[in-house]
Amino acid sequence: MRVYAAFVVALVSLLATNSAVLAVTTPTKLAKLTAPEFTDNENRQRRLLRKQEGAELGDEERTSTQNLGNSLMRVFSKEATRKYYLDLFKRADFTANLPKLAKKGGPDRLNDALKKLRKAGISEEKFAELKGAAAKYADDWYRIYGKLDPIRA
């Protein structure tokens, strides 16, 4: 009889626990957790925390970190433009790439690249070398694609 009473008490407590869990997780209460207002409030709180963390920095520290980030961006972007335009000259060295470069602007493209490389801060020796390569490329390009080649004419 005691075993039976313990069994009934266990079932009743299990039933009470399940009903309490079900009462907490009703669809309406779950919907409140996924409602846009809840997520908006959560996002607003996160933004507020980020602002407070940023406010802990002084004005000088904040501007110095911004200036550091800006200068790093300038360094990396200069390096990226320099690399891109130097690659143009590497591609122009191969005669197999002449038709591809001709479709994309011909000698003017390399002359524009020279201007941008000069702004990016390339050395004078390298600039003179690349200028000679651009002139040679322009001669070849005008000879072949300007119908001045005696073989093609």
Curated annotation (Swiss-Prot):
What are the GO cellular component annotations? extracellular region; host cell cytoplasm; host cell nucleolus
Residues of the signal peptide? 1-23
Inducing or repressing factors:
Expression is induced during host plant infection.
* The organism's place on the tree of life at top rank: Eukaryota
Q: Does the keyword Oxidoreductase apply?
A: no
Q: Where is this motif: RxLR-dEER?
A: 47-62
Any idea where this protein resides? Secreted; Host nucleus, Host nucleolus; Host nucleus; Host cytoplasm
Q: Which UniProt keywords apply?
A: Host cytoplasm, Host nucleus, Secreted, Signal
Its predominant location is secreted
Q: What does this protein do?
A: Secreted effector that does not produce a statistically significant enhancement of P.infestans colonization of Nicotiana benthamiana leaves.
Q: Which family does it belong to?
A: Belongs to the RxLR effector family.
What's in the domain note? The RxLR-dEER motif acts to carry the protein into the host cell cytoplasm through binding to cell surface phosphatidylinositol-3-phosphate.
The protein, known as:
RxLR effector protein Avr-vnt11
Question: What species does this protein belong to?
Answer: Phytophthora infestans (strain T30-4)
